[in-house]
């Protein structure tokens, strides 16, 4: 698990899971991202009162969207977890294209169709360009 998403190794342009976390997460959250902005964040497992670090999540989003060689979709979800340690620490769990994620009580009904539309346009352009 990484707090710095830019340090995650790549395999043919894809991120790899590279570390097993023995102690598990105190809480797990799905962050809905559109064009680099957090649209919503929902807890999907663990303690709802143990929140991830906003600053860490913002750095994760920036690092992911600026990773060399990545064709980052405009709409995606970033799953993060809070791990137990002296200071609670936010780690990346995984990233999903927006079409391939559970919405886990996404409360922003205005942005939901926009996120699907933006992802679909990005996908169509990606296919044309390959």
Regions found by a protein language model. Give the residues of each.
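Active-site nucleotide/adenylate-binding loops and adjacent lid/helix of ATP-dependent enzymes
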Residues: 1-68
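A short glycine-rich, hydrophobically flanked beta-strand micro-motif that places a catalytic Asp/Glu
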Residues: 29, 71-85
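Anionic group-transfer/hydrolysis microenvironments
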Residues: 42, 81, 96
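Poly-acidic low-complexity segments
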Residues: 53, 79, 107-110
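C-terminal active-site "lid" helix and adjoining low-complexity regulatory extension at the edge
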Residues: 71, 84-130
């Amino acid at each position: 698990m990484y707090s710095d998403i830019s340090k995650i190794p790549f395999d043919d342009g894809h991120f790899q899971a590279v570390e097993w976390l023995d102690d598990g997460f105190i809480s797990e959250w799905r962050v809905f991202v559109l064009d680099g902005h957090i649209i919503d964040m929902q807890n999907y497992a663990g303690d709802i009162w143990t929140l991830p670090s906003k600053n860490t999540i913002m750095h994760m989003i920036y690092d992911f969207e600026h990773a060399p060689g990545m064709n980052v979709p405009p709409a995606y979800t970033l799953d993060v977890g809070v791990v137990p340690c002296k200071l609670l620490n936010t780690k990346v769990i995984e990233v999903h294209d927006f079409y391939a994620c559970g919405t886990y009580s996404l409360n922003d009904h205005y942005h939901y169709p926009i996120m699907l539309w933006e992802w679909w346009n990005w996908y169509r352009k990606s296919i044309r360009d390959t």
